[in-house]
Amino acid sequence: MMDNINFEFSNASQGSRLQLQQQPPQPFNLQDLNMIQYNQPSSPWTTETFSGLTPYDCTANQSFPVQCSSSKPYPSSFHPYHHQSSDSPSLDQSVSMIPMQPLPDQYMKPLYQRSCSNDFAATNASSASYSLSFEASHDPQELCRRTYSNSNVTHLNFTSSQHQPKQSHPRFSSPPSFSIHGGSMAPNCVNKTRIRWTQDLHEKFVECVNRLGGADKATPKAILKRMDSDGLTIFHVKSHLQKYRIAKYMPESQEGKFEKRACAKELSQLDTRTGVQIKEALQLQLDVQRHLHEQLEIQRNLQLRIEEQGKQLKMMMEQQQKNKESLLKKLPDAEASLSLLDPHIHSPPSPFLVHDAEALMLTSYEDTQLQSTKS
């Protein structure tokens, strides 16, 4: 790494020498920097330039934006490096006499490594193409590589010095391929390898899915952990799980739809028949309940009549008992009257009197029974 740049190019055949001399620091506005135009003879690297290779690279560690323009010449007062070949007499003498001066250290710290063994000004051609790339060490987004060709088309390529190794020679180096988005380097896509889902592997997958609660609850990460197969990644499991869900919840075929419709018709007819039968059974049940209610009413009336008859029988028995007691009371009185009439006759009580009393009681009972039936 060098703080000051001294470009020295020697040509033994023509004896011309071009040397960069360091000048005192001058104010330099890099934002107004335009395209540096070189009108030099062709170099040995012209073929390489047209082939897509850069003849040499110059790098400068500075964090500043560079504005490039291919239509306006670079003013001589702001040339960081300006030189004129001795073989080109068409340029202005005042411009050609201005020596090439490098930028001060505080503005630019160029990194340049080149093994210079060829002459820079010894070749004869009408145009030359050079490549100049500035690399920002502090801000990786402000790196610009500019390539100048005969068509004066400017090509910009933004690179980051933090991720690029230093190149010793541009001829054996390739242009940077990093692209910066928001200060970070975009990672390369991982190549996905395809695998063949065999029957055993699929059965193992289905078993893991069922253990995890079905296709809806299973996750690719859990399935991959349970399967534990070599060469199987989460991308394979995720894709296969999606296909498995689609196949599981695929709509039924037309055959299945027709069968389903036929079953639905049969079920509707069966439901109609069953409804009619249930209705008839309910009607019969209502009729039976009505008959039972009528029978219960009849039994209730009979029970009431039986209770009334029992009360009447009880009253009749009580009346008969009273009549019997009254007759028994009358018998001693009759015997006493007979003894008063004939005291010498002591005859036992006649058994016919008791029989007569019973017959009397029966007749009285029959009379009361007839009266109750009539009423």
Swiss-Prot record:
GO terms for molecular function: DNA binding; DNA-binding transcription factor activity. Its main location: nucleus. Residues 220-245 bind DNA. GO terms for cellular component: nucleus. Residues 279-299 form a coiled coil. Residues 159-178 are annotated as: Disordered. GO terms for biological process: regulation of DNA-templated transcription. InterPro entries: Homeodomain-like_sf (IPR009057), Myb_CC_LHEQLE (IPR025756), Myb_dom (IPR017930), Myb_dom_plants (IPR006447), PHR1-like (IPR046955), SANT/Myb (IPR001005). A motif (LHEQLE) lies at residues 292-297. It is found in: Nucleus. Residues 159-171 have a biased composition (Polar residues). Keywords: Coiled coil, DNA-binding, Nucleus, Transcription, Transcription regulation. Residues 189-249 form the HTH myb-type domain. Belongs to the MYB-CC family. This is Myb family transcription factor PHL5.
